[in-house]
Amino acid sequence: MRLLFPFLFLFIVSCSQNNKYEYILKEDNFKYNFELNKDQSFVDLEEGFTFYNATNQNSQKTPVVLIHGFSVPSYIWDPTFVMLREKGFYIISLDLYGRGNSKNIDGDYTDELFANQVLQLLNHLEIEKADFVGLSNGGRVISKIADINSDIVGDLIYVASSSFLNKSKALETDVSKKEVREFIGNNYPTIAKGQLQDFKYPEKFEGWDDKYEELLKYKGFARALISTTKNHYTMDEIHENINNLNLPVYTIWGDSDNVVVYDEFSERLNELLPNRNEYFISNSGHLPQMENQDEFNKVILSILND
């Protein structure tokens, strides 16, 4: 009988850990019970409901759309959103499917899915032209937007963009329940703390990991991350086309980014987008818009006011 107690203890601990994760369903009740502030809304798009922020809708300036990265949703843009709101810009940010407060869908999470989500939102808002700012994986999304509908694009502004990396699409893009279970078991206990590695000076961002822990409560988050990764591919052809269309392109990098390492693709980037304007933000890692806000804000304003 005594031998049963260690096994029982381990079983209880295991169940306790599993119960921490992915227990909230983002269905209609989630949307209806959400407490929105004055800038926040939900809209039902083709693949599901989308959470977004919008302000200064009557501004005469070109609307600016902020697209977040791989896993952290639109709150990653909060400092920039507030700054541009105060400067009188019409600003839109949103949570892409599978992230934050938007629907976790059952299908494949592709660049095309995200791009169409943004385009449908802009159609809902009756926006015909906008400047697009893509952070990290959001760079892939704005590239795909330009690929689908270049007429809607004013400026393309890439911030620490991962869209220029060499990627091979997985042969099998379906996500199994086993893959989800293993991802949660292997990654969820440490994934929030890992977000601090995006910063050059993580000690300045106390609580950033705690905020990410909240995302782990939503059922389907792990599947969304796995599916997104499986559906990545090299975007060289799209970027060549962007260059041929003479769309205004700007790239902004943290000078100490260890997540997207500039030197690994800089030569290819010069070949793909030789006419881009490029900026490096000092004393910042993968999130220069947070880590060196003064310098980043000066750069983004110089672009948007040009």
Model-derived segments and spans:
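Alpha/beta-hydrolase fold catalytic core
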Residues: R2-T62, E86-F89, N305-D306
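Conserved HGGG/HGGXW glycine-rich cap/lid loop of the alpha/beta-hydrolase fold
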Residues: Q17, T55-N101
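Active-site loop/oxyanion-hole signature of alpha/beta-hydrolase fold enzymes
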Residues: L45-G48, S93-V133
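Flexible "cap/lid" loop of the alpha/beta hydrolase fold
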Residues: K144-I148, D155-N186
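Short beta-strand/loop motif that positions the catalytic acidic residue
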Residues: L245, T251-W253
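Acidic catalytic loop of the alpha/beta-hydrolase fold
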Residues: S256-V260, H286
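Catalytic active-site module of serine/aspartate enzymes centered on a nucleophile-bearing elbow/loop
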Residues: R276-D306
